[in-house]
Amino acid sequence: IEFRNLDNAKFGYKVFRENHYFAINWLRVRNSLHLVAQAEEWFSPSRIRQIKKGLKNGAKVREAHTAKEIRDFAHMLHKVYSAKIRRHFPSKDFFQQLEKQMMRSRQSRIFIVTYKDKIIGGSACIYSDKSAYLWFSGGMRKTYALQYPGILAVWYALHDAKQRGYHHLEFMDVGLPFRKHGYREFVLRFGGKQISTRRWFRFKWEWLNRMLIKMYE
């Protein structure tokens, strides 16, 4: 059992401990868009060069608008997504439901990277108040290395969020603080800052739970 997204580290502390939960610090990466005139000001010089090269080499980025584009985006993402980023990847129907239920109210957007009319990358964002959250992103970087599809997908999500007046964009699920995480290193080069939050866990196997409580307390 897991509880997450608790911004206040002290919230529920006593109750969680009494019920044999243990806490692990979890990392998030957040770009503060309201502090700069352009989202790109936070990017590393190498990221800027890669974005310019990708666009110069024929890649285009825009918001998805049709059901077919969303299906093609989901199909592409399923093929390239690494289990190291997110183990439980949703079904392709999930993105169709996202389009039907959320995009109409502008609570989410899907961006696609295209090359010669083929979707080679993209990202999915959700929005709440003044914050944008990058939920999924990926690209066919091995097949289309010169177009930098994964980089363009993240860049455009940040660029669009800034243009629409969001104060922050947060990258979801970038991993444990003590484990090397390729996706976290990738997104940090877009200029975001690491933030540590607390997650509470409890396993059904008592012996394992006791061992982990001792390990993390």
Residue ranges and their predicted role:
Residues I1-F3, A132, L169:
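Hydrophobic residues within beta-strands of alpha/beta enzymes
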Residues N5-L146, D160, L176:
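A conserved beta-strand-loop-helix scaffold within acyl/acetyltransferase catalytic domains
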Residues R49, Y156, G182:
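Short Gly/charged-rich anion-binding patches and loops
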Residues L152-H168:
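Conserved acyl-CoA
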